[in-house]
Amino acid sequence: ASLAQSYLNFGNEEDLKYAVALYNFADKYRTITYDQNTYAGGAKDVQDDISWAAGWLYLATGDSSYKTFLDTFMNSSGQGMSGQSGCQWGVYSPMNWNNVSMGAAILQAEITKSASDWAKVTTYLDSKATSESQYYCEDTWGSARHNVAVQMTALITSKYKKESGKDYSSWAKAQMGMILGDNSTGKNLVVGFNENSPKYPHHRSASGHAYDPTDEGTPKWDAENGHVLVGALVGGPTGTDFS
């Protein structure tokens, strides 16, 4: 998907060549993703990823076979080869490392310009973008990543507001304001942004410190990070911490 995007942006034919090759490989060997994945928290599905890539390759090449794959996944309610349901009834997860169905849904809607396809996207976003004064918390484990992921897809949908019928830009701006410090604590969640930025993000190389069991002078675990990881987003609060 990223190579197809790069081709669309920069016109490098080699990017497109390898985007097609990787797509074909992934489609041919789908079971590798889940049969060979022994990590308990690892990705066990692949259809969303291939659909995401198919959408970009359709935009890059105009080859209808890519659109067919995307449409089949997005319009199916059944279980695919990997056990992953299609998205006929909508999207149920923010864009993340393990599920890119939202991205695929937006691509399909952009391509088809269909009101019903946009509805798959906006129905989900309507359920999340409910308040400009309340921090949106999808999950307390790293809530900020999910917050900004929903912001991103909400802003893309707003870009196509003539087709989607929705404009979430005000909501997204309010959510980003809270992340950057416009909240009851005055703290922001972005490292290196200002004096109220996080000083102790969990990042091994940025810490600049090492474990020192003999207390020979190495800074303790609670010391500020030795290197500023500018732009990094820390975990984030619960849904009520910024109230």
Regions found by a protein language model. Give the residues of each.
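Catalytic cores of extracellular degradative/oxidative enzymes
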Residues: 1-88
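Aromatic (Trp/Tyr) and acidic
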Residues: 1-9, 47-72, 95-131, 140-243
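Acidic, serine/threonine- and proline-rich low-complexity regulatory regions
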Residues: 36-39, 86-90, 130-142, 159-161
